[in-house]
């Protein structure tokens, strides 16, 4: 099939161990926030598609959940989803936290990365390694890491980047663009993401929840946008429910006198107003649902396949 427009378009799977910088990288390449970021590992639960243009080439960047050794049902679904994103991609970027791997060569991230490399089935010509966070380390420490992770024949290219500062990102994007097949654009050129607004709103609130509570709340919370009402004045009224597994966790989310949930709501509302470019009325509720992580409906909302035991 001919392509008279001279455009190219395809999928780039961004994979790596938890907290390697996948979401920060995708957000930086897209130029706007499409995936939530926090210091907590396993923040991304579903594949998020960010859309970036480089000349006449469209990159659909799939921010996959971090790949690690799964234990819970939700963990298994996330890891399976990540590998599915790799199988469907036109090229793969394996991103690693170079500072962590140099400082802790036998640590969890190093083990997860080794497992990823052993399972990676993509042709070397379609795979690149991105050493992230180089702005915080000495270049002399990178050579042994490159020799360990990228022996000849494993990757087509190795890029030294900082997803936070932007170092090396244009070179990485240019290589990805070269891998895209000729064809029509998959999305309008001004579209930044492929994610329903209700789900994006839930993800933003979940990010603020994680950022606010740090280590007080484990991965036992989920956010769902139960009501989305467009108002005549152009504003939107959003009702969200934060589901936790125990009453004690509900108390943590609410905070003394409701101050914690108020702060979470204010932070989420400000970001939603910035993204939607209109006034947002956000109402948060906290409910205890012990088995939310076992709900098939929850998996469907996240676009994950429900793994059977």
Q: What function would you assign to each model-found segment?
A:
Residues 125-128, 135-193:
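Canonical P-loop GTPase G-domain recognition
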Residues 87-114, 124-142:
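Conserved Switch II/interswitch segment of TRAFAC-class P-loop GTPases
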Residues 44, 67-69, 102, 137-138, ...:
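Catalytic P-loop NTPase motifs of RecA-like helicase/translocase cores
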Residues 21, 168, 260:
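Conserved glycine(s) of the Walker
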Residues 13, 27, 46, 50, ...:
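Solvent-exposed alpha-helical segments within well-ordered globular domains of core cellular machineries
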Residues 1-91, 96:
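Conserved G1/Walker A P-loop phosphate-binding module
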Residues 32, 51-55, 85-92, 98-99, ...:
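Conserved, well-folded catalytic cores of nucleic-acid-processing
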Residues 197-309:
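P-loop NTP-binding site
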